[in-house]
Amino acid sequence: MNNRLALNISALFFAFFVVFVLLFFTKDRLFEYYFTYLESLKKTVELQSDLESGKIVLFGSSELVFYPNQKFLPQNFFNNDLKIPLRVQGNEGHQSFVILSQLAAFDNKKVRENAKVVVLLSPSWFTGSSDNGLTMAKFLEYMNLGMMNKLYFEGQTQDKYKFLISDYIQNNISYIKEPTFIYETPYKDIKDEYINNKIKKFIIEKFDEKYVKSQDIKYFKQDLNFNDLKNEAKNIEISSSNNNLGINNEYYSKYIEPQIAKNNFPFEIVIPPSLEKNEEYQDFLDLLDFLDSYKIKPLFIMQDLHPYVFSKNRENANLLMETIKSKVLEHNFEYMDMWTYKKEDYEIGTLTDIVHFGELGWVKANQKIVDYFVK
């Protein structure tokens, strides 16, 4: 018994000694790591807090920023008029892969249990050339050093997503000027540094305890008359006096009239040759797979391309939109389809230009968000 006790005590002291030695020789690196990435980690706090608290987070692209003064733009309507907390995330070029990357960086039990996610899809993401996926510049804008540290050292997401993101970085590393260690080094190499990774995880978790504040947000049903709001939206929208397509005058004069003069109107929708070679579509499938773990199923809203403007090759575009819709429904996610195949199904004013929602389009989308999440 005494020998066993002595052996256990010796093992304990040896373990303390090993930890002490490790800390002694790595303390400078640890302090350097903490203070180097502190400011970058602070940039991750708000989105993580919102996802964990159950605030509605709407991911989108240029439609969120192109016309910032629209009354029914979600960040204006929900937060200012309804006093319902909602966060928007994204700007032009913010597409499926970087949405997946951000969610993977914050993957934890709280997020999986509470997150209320809306994804605004644009048909333009999936059209054009085969390399229609995310640009590295946009990836770096949203996956900064703090986000990458969260992803590799704290995020609880499956390794397959970490490898997926790492592979994307390595395949596009030439677009990064003077890449830092976390971008330059493949995840398979980072993963092997077990002790170093555990220490970094500990530091980030202590950072979260101090800075990440996630109080549960509850939503309560409101008495809203969306028919009245739709009529208001139609009245707000500036009348189009130089066209009968519901396109705002400035946009029509600047972008449409010159193309008509060149006999380039209406426009053709270019479709990649196959789904397998459609980068954005493949990224989208990865996003769907990732979101399967969420308790509250996400809402996807497919926007439109103006059917009076993009009329050529709309048949093939319609097949692509139907395929995208079917994939969302296969995962039992909620889907709002605002894509119109036929001109007669399009309501003038839904778009304010040829791809972005007008006030009427936003009211329709907002109604769906309220009906789905505010119960």
Give the location of each predicted region.
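Alpha-helical transmembrane signal-anchor/signal-peptide segments
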Residues: F25-E46
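Histidine-centered active-site loop/cap adjacent to the catalytic His
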Residues: R4, L351-K375
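Secreted/periplasmic serine-hydrolase-like ester/acetyl group-modifying domain
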Residues: L140-L285
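Hydrophobic membrane-insertion alpha-helices, especially the h-region
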Residues: L7-D28
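Membrane-embedded segments
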Residues: L64-Q158
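A structural motif corresponding to the C-terminal end of an alpha-helix
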Residues: F284-L299, K327-M336
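Substrate-gating cap/lid alpha-helix
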Residues: L305-D337
